[in-house]
């Protein structure tokens, strides 16, 4: 079986030769070809070379267009890139440091906005070069993560209490953008869209259920309607929201090393495909 066939067989409940291997590789992939991570994160040509080389070297079953956030800089966020560490949002100059700016924020077009368009180019190239052998995965930011990129993570955490109506309006914007961007990635060649929502593990179960879950569900449903399989990735401990995650109906749910796989299985149910939960420091 090819890697693509292996992943799709698993998701469709069909026989397969062995479980697929589909880790998230970003800085690791850049390292494999000697590229600076800051370049990998903004240049689809470097990303494609790194993804293909890494997948073929280690026998991974997918290639992914995941880099740093592409939506935020195209919405005016001040993003700092580094050679050998992940990006950072300049919260002192957050694009939505003033809440009034949300009403003036224009929805960028993924087909022409510089950063999102670069990812589309990368996915099209991945599809052309290895799309028959490897599953091609795109990526969008989830509502909590995307909102934090625009507002600043610390400010957003206060907004949940100080101005919940603003949070809902902001989530409306970022989810609409996520669906639009995800649809464009499917058209470019992605068969699966990952949803990265790391900040969702920081808000606690009450706020997650009130604010985050409904918008994650809308995003997942929108990506499914676009023809994509959906993979949810929430970093950190999701122990207290696992049952809610199981109700999102994602095709794959990533399980971080902070969450026992047995607990994830118990809470999400017997049919949910789970991916993880290797500790990249201790185990690797």
PLM regions and their residue ranges:
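Short, glycine/charge-rich beta-strand/loop segments that flank catalytic centers
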Residues: 65-75, 138-145
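Segments that shape or occlude catalytic/ligand-binding pockets
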Residues: 40-69
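Short active-site-proximal "capping" loops at secondary-structure junctions
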Residues: 26-30, 69-72
């Amino acid at each position: 079986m090819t890697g693509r066939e292996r992943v799709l067989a698993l998701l469709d409940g069909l026989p397969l030769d062995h479980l697929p291997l589909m880790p998230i590789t970003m800085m690791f992939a850049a390292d494999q070809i000697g590229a600076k991570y800051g370049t990998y994160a903004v240049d689809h040509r470097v990303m494609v070379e790194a993804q293909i080389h890494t997948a073929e070297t280690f026998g991974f079953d997918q290639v992914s267009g995941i880099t740093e956030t592409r939506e935020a800089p195209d919405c005016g966020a001040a993003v700092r890139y580094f050679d050998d560490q992940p990006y950072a949002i300049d919260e002192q100059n957050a694009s939505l440091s003033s809440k009034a700016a949300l009403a003036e924020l224009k929805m960028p077009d993924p087909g022409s906005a510089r950063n999102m368009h670069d990812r589309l180019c990368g996915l099209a190239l991945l599809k052309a070069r290895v799309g028959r052998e490897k599953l091609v995965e795109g990526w969008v930011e989830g509502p909590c993560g995307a909102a934090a990129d625009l507002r600043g993570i610390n400010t957003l955490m206060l907004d949940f209490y100080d101005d919940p109506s603003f949070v809902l309006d902001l989530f409306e914007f970022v989810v609409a953008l996520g669906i639009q961007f995800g649809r464009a990635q499917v058209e470019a060649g992605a068969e699966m869209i990952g949803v990265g929502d790391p900040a969702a593990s920081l808000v606690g179960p009450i706020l997650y259920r009130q604010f985050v879950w409904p918008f994650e569900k809308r995003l997942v449903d929108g990506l499914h309607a676009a023809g994509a399989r959906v993979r949810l990735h929430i970093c950190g401990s999701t122990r207290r929201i696992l049952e809610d995650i199981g109700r999102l109906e994602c095709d794959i749910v990533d399980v971080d090393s902070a969450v026992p796989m047995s607990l994830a299985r118990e809470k999400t149910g017997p049919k949910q495909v789970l991916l993880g939960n290797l500790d990249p420091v201790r185990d690797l």
